[in-house]
Design a protein with these regions (language model features):
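Extracellular loop-to-transmembrane helix junctions
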Residues: 71-115, 119
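Loop-to-helix transition at the N-terminal end of transmembrane alpha-helices
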Residues: 77-91, 204, 275, 383-388
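Membrane-interfacial loop- and helix-cap regions that link adjacent transmembrane helices
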Residues: 46-47, 102-145, 149, 154-176, ...
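Central hydrophobic cores of alpha-helical transmembrane segments in multi-pass inner-membrane proteins
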Residues: 65, 90-102, 181-189
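Helix-loop interface residues and adjacent transmembrane-helix termini in multi-pass membrane transporters
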Residues: 67, 76-80, 190, 262-265, ...
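Hydrophobic alpha-helical transmembrane segments
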Residues: 73, 186-191, 368-374
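Membrane-interface "cap" regions at the ends of multi-pass membrane proteins
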Residues: 1-69, 76, 93-98, 120-122
Length: 477
C-alpha cells in the first residue's frame, strides 16, 4: 500500500473515530445509515449537515435583503468608503464567527467529558457563554442575541412588504406586510437548521440572480441625466451607512445553531470566511453599479428595486427575493423558536407537531413590530449599531479572551490559534482592537447616527406608516 493510501486511510479512520455519540445518534436519526431510496431522497432534500450545507446556510443568510439596501448605504458613504467598509467588516465578521466556532467546540468538548447528553437538544450561543463563563454572560448573550434575532426577523418581514409592492401596488406596503406575516408563520414547520439543505441552496441561487440582475441592469441603464454622487455629505449619513454594512456582515448570530446542525462541527472554522468571500462578489458589484447609475436619488429610496426599470427581469428578481425572505425569516426566527420551546418545556419532545404549535406565539410580536416600524433601510443601521455590535463582535471577542485567560486553558484548548495568528498574544491584541473599534465606531458614532436617522424617519412618516417611501402619495398616510 502506497504512502498516499496510508495517509488517506489514517485520516478516514481518525474522522470516523472522532464522531461523538451524539453525532452517531444523529446520523442514525437522519437515515444516513439507511440506503433505501426513500432515505436517500430524504437525505438529499432535507437532512443537511455537511460543510457545504453550512456554507450555503451562512452565505444565504448573510446576503438577504441587505443586497437591496447596500446601494442606499453607498449613497451615504460613496463608492470608496462603501467598498472599504464591506471588505473590512467582512473580514472582521469572519474573525468573530471563527471565535464563536472555537467557543462552541470548547464548550461541547468540556460538556461531553462530563457525559452531558445533547440528544434532542440544540445548543445555543447563550448556553455556550453560560457553560464557559457563567450566568451573567449567559444573561448578556441571551438579551443581545434574542433581541437581535427578533429585529432581524422584523426586518425580513418589512422587506417582504416593501418588495411585493413593486410588482403590485394594489395594496399598500403595510397591508402586504400583514399578509406576508401570516405566510411567514409557516416557518414553524421547519424543525431546525439541519432541515434547510435545499432551501439554503435555492436561496443563494435567488440572491445571486438578483445581485447580477441589479449590476447588469444598472450598467445597461447608464447614468441618470444630471446624476450626482455627493456622498459622503455629513457625519450622520456616513456613520449610518457604515453601520448598515456592519449589520450586513453580522449575520453570524446563528453560527452556533448552524454548527450544531453539522455532523462534524469542528470543520466549521473557515466556512464563514469562504461564504463572506462569495457574498462580496455579489454585494460590491451590485451596490457600486446601482449607485453609479442613480447616485443621490438612492438617499430617498432604501430599496434599490424602486429605481430599476419595471420589466419581467425586475419582477422575477422581486419574486425570488420574496421567496428568499421566507427562508431568511426562518433562519432568524428558528433560534427564537428553540428558546421559546426551552422556556415552556417542549424542546426535547419527540412530537414535532406539538413543538410547531408551541412556536406560533413567537411570530406575533415580530408581525406587530414590522407594522409599527416599516422603515426599510434605516432600521438595519439602528439594529446594527445597538445590537449586532455586541452580539457578534464585542461579546465573542471578550468571551474568547476570558475563556482562555489562564495558561492552563490555553494549553488544553481544543482549538489553538490559527496559522495567521502566530501566538495567543496576537489573538488577544486583535480581539482587543475589534472590541475598541466596534465599541467606538459602531456603538458610539454608529449608534448616534442611526438613532438620529431613525427618529427622522418616525417624524417624517410616523409609526404604523401605511406605505413607507411609496411614490404614490395616496398610500403614504
Amino acid at each position: 500500500m502506497g504512502l498516499q493510501s496510508l495517509v488517506a486511510l489514517a485520516t478516514h479512520t481518525g474522522e470516523n473515530n472522532s464522531y461523538t455519540e451524539v453525532e452517531k445518534d444523529r446520523q442514525e436519526q437522519d437515515g444516513l445509515v439507511d440506503n433505501s431510496m426513500r432515505a436517500l431522497a430524504k437525505k438529499f432534500l432535507w437532512h443537511g449537515g455537511s460543510v457545504y450545507d453550512a456554507w450555503f446556510s451562512c452565505a444565504s443568510n448573510q446576503v438577504a435583503q441587505v443586497l437591496l439596501t447596500l446601494p442606499y448605504s453607498f449613497s451615504q458613504l460613496g463608492i470608496v468608503w462603501g467598498v472599504t467598509f464591506q471588505v473590512f467588516y467582512g473580514l472582521l465578521g469572519s474573525w468573530t464567527a471563527y471565535l464563536i466556532s472555537c467557543l462552541y467546540v470548547e464548550y461541547r468538548a468540556r460538556k461531553e467529558k462530563e457525559n452531558v447528553n445533547f440528544k434532542n437538544h440544540v445548543i445555543q450561543w447563550f448556553e455556550v457563554l453560560d457553560g464557559l463563563l457563567g450566568p451573567y454572560w449567559k444573561a448578556a448573550g441571551f438579551t443581545f442575541n434574542c433581541t437581535f434575532l427578533l429585529f432581524g426577523s422584523v426586518i425580513q418581514l418589512i422587506a417582504c412588504g416593501s418588495n411585493i409592492y413593486y410588482i403590485s401596488d394594489r395594496f399598500d406596503k403595510r397591508t402586504w406586510t400583514i399578509i406576508f406575516g401570516a405566510c411567514c408563520m409557516t416557518t414553524v414547520l421547519v424543525p431546525s437548521f439541519h432541515n434547510y439543505r435545499i432551501w439554503s441552496f435555492l436561496g443563494l441561487g435567488m440572491t445571486t440572480y438578483t445581485a447580477w440582475y441589479m449590476t447588469i441592469t444598472a450598467l445597461v441603464h447608464g447614468k441618470d441625466p444630471g446624476v450626482k454622487h455627493s456622498a459622503p455629505n455629513n457625519l450622520v449619513q456616513y456613520f449610518t451607512g457604515a453601520t448598515n454594512i456592519l449589520y450586513t456582515f453580522g449575520g453570524h448570530a446563528v453560527t452556533v445553531e448552524i454548527m450544531h446542525a453539522m455532523w462534524k462541527p469542528s470543520k466549521f472554522k473557515s466556512v464563514y470566511l469562504f461564504s463572506t468571500l462569495y457574498v462580496l462578489t455579489l454585494t460590491i458589484p451590485s451596490a457600486t453599479a446601482v449607485y453609479w447609475a442613480f447616485g443621490d436619488e438612492l438617499l430617498h429610496n432604501g430599496n434599490a428595486l424602486a429605481l430599476l426599470p419595471k420589466n419581467v427581469f425586475r419582477d422575477l428578481a422581486v419574486v425570488l427575493m420574496l421567496l428568499h425572505q421566507f427562508i431568511t425569516f426562518g433562519f432568524a426566527c428558528t433560534p427564537l423558536y428553540f428558546v421559546w420551546e426551552k422556556i415552556i418545556g417542549v424542546h426535547r419532545s419527540p412530537r414535532f407537531l406539538l413543538r410547531a404549535a408551541a412556536r406560533i406565539p413567537v411570530v406575533i410580536p415580530i408581525w406587530f413590530m414590522a407594522v409599527i416600524f416599516p422603515f426599510f433601510g434605516p432600521i438595519n443601521s439602528a439594529v446594527g449599531s445597538l445590537l449586532v455590535t455586541f452580539t457578534v463582535y464585542i461579546i465573542p471577542c471578550l468571551a474568547h479572551m476570558l475563556t482562555f485567560r489562564t495558561a492552563f486553558a490555553r494549553e488544553n484548548a481544543v482549538e489553538k490559534p490559527p496559522f495567521i495568528m502566530p501566538s495567543w498574544a496576537a489573538v488577544y491584541v486583535f480581539n482587543f482592537f475589534v472590541v475598541v473599534w466596534v465599541f467606538v465606531v459602531g456603538v458610539g458614532f454608529g449608534g448616534w447616527a442611526s438613532t438620529v436617522n431613525f427618529v427622522h424617519q418616525i417624524k417624517t412618516f410616523g409609526i404604523f406608516a401605511k406605505c413607507y417611501q411609496c411614490p404614490n402619495n395616496s398610500h403614504r398616510h
